[in-house]
């Protein structure tokens, strides 16, 4: 149980090795934790608004965050200093490094008379001059705003999930849409996470389902159904398991008892689409989930402001579907 945020968690992410866990929340200060024992290693001070998203690069050298203060910041992971701060015209909803770490992408909200836009920047020699540089690509989103985003294979494409449930793939060399999922989801996409090999990804949607998609064709492969909005979903790196977390929207939560089971982490079998376990813990909706890269534990961040890291016992690995 990691206590260090004063307000609800917005996103959590492990680095590639899994020794560090990064968390962002609405209290303006992203944190980094040592995932093995839950020790807080430091905070990244500098944002003036709720931090909506974060991502750490492949080498755990740089951290990118996007916030409601209309900036994207790139940080030095080890020293906690700001390498670059990029101003935007509305709050930043998603931000991700590419696999190579040479580029980063971020998207802004449709607000204050501004359209939602997707930006791609070159971060190879990131320094304070990045705020004056033009992005290498900007794509205006005409229809619905972006609510989650992933880099496709080989840094050639970007997969975007939208507020209307649509998913699209963009070719960043041409700057145009190449694949559109249509209406597999009927409500907004809250989260998307890739499988370990990058061939598929899982979506979490307000329409109470999570779905598994092929990451090149956007073909819907599997559907995991629940009774309430899904805020986050993650794929196990070692087993055919998916974990879903959610609950009602923060606005609709009353003081229900946790026994109602609305705020559990729910485990589904990736292929059979059957739920086989639930884990309690949070006193409110789960906003973000992440599997440890070794697949032996997972972390969840909730509306209650806590991050919980849970290790699996041996019975979890003796697969019940064999």
Curated annotation (Swiss-Prot):
Question: Which Gene Ontology MF annotations are present?
Answer: RNA binding; translation initiation factor activity
Q: Where does the source fall among the domains of life?
A: Eukaryota
* GO terms under biological process: formation of cytoplasmic translation initiation complex
**Which Gene3D superfamilies does UniProt cross-reference here?**
YVTN repeat-like/Quinoprotein amine dehydrogenase (2.130.10.10)
For this UniProt record, the keywords arranged alphabetically read as follows: Cytoplasm, Initiation factor, Protein biosynthesis, Repeat, WD repeat
Is Repeat tagged as a keyword? yes
Which Pfam families does the entry mention? Answer: EIF3I (PF24805)
Cellular compartments annotated: Cytoplasm
InterPro entries tied to this protein: eIF3i, WD40/YVTN_repeat-like_dom_sf, WD40_repeat_CS, WD40_repeat_dom_sf, WD40_rpt
Q: SMART domains under this entry?
A: WD40
**Subunit annotation:** Component of the eukaryotic translation initiation factor 3 (eIF-3) complex. The eIF-3 complex interacts with pix.
Functional summary from the UniProt entry: Component of the eukaryotic translation initiation factor 3 (eIF-3) complex, which is involved in protein synthesis of a specialized repertoire of mRNAs and, together with other initiation factors, stimulates binding of mRNA and methionyl-tRNAi to the 40S ribosome. The eIF-3 complex specifically targets and initiates translation of a subset of mRNAs involved in cell proliferation.
The identity of this protein, by name, is Eukaryotic translation initiation factor 3 subunit I
Q: Which organism is it from?
A: Drosophila virilis (Fruit fly)
Which gene is annotated as encoding this protein in its UniProt record?
eIF3i
């Amino acid at each position: 149980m990691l206590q260090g945020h004063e307000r609800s968690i917005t996103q959590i992410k492990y680095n590639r090795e899994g020794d560090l866990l990064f968390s962002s929340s609405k209290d303006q200060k992203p944190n980094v934790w040592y995932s093995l024992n839950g020790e807080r290693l430091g905070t990244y001070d500098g944002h003036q608004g709720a931090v909506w998203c974060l991502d750490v690069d492949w080498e755990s050298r740089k951290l990118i965050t996007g916030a409601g203060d209309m900036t994207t910041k790139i940080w030095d992971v080890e020293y906690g200093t700001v390498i670059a701060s990029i101003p935007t015209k509305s709050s930043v909803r998603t931000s991700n490094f590419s696999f190579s770490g040479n580029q980063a992408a971020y998207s802004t909200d449709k607000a204050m008379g501004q359209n939602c836009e997707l930006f791609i920047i070159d971060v190879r020699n990131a320094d304070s001059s990045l705020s004056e540089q033009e992005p290498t690509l900007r794509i205006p989103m005409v229809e619905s705003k972006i609510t989650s985003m992933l880099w496709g294979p080989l840094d050639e494409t970007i997969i975007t999930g939208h507020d209307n449930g649509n998913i699209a793939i963009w070719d960043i060399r041409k700057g145009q849409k190449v694949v559109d999922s249509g209406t597999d989801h009927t409500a907004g996409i809250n989260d998307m996470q890739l499988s370990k090999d990058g061939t598929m990804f899982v979506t979490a949607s307000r329409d109470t389902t999570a779905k598994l998609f092929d990451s090149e064709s956007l073909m819907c492969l599997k559907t995991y159904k629940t009774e309430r909005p899904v805020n986050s979903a993650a794929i196990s790196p070692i087993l055919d398991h998916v974990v879903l977390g959610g609950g009602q929207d923060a606005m609709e939560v009353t003081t229900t008892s946790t026994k109602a089971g609305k705020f559990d982490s729910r485990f589904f079998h990736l292929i059979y689409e059957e739920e086989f376990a639930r884990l309690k813990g949070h006193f409110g909706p789960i906003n973000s989930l992440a599997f440890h890269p070794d697949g032996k534990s997972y972390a969840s961040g909730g509306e209650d402001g806590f991050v919980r890291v849970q290790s699996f016992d041996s019975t979890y690995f003796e697969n019940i579907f064999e």
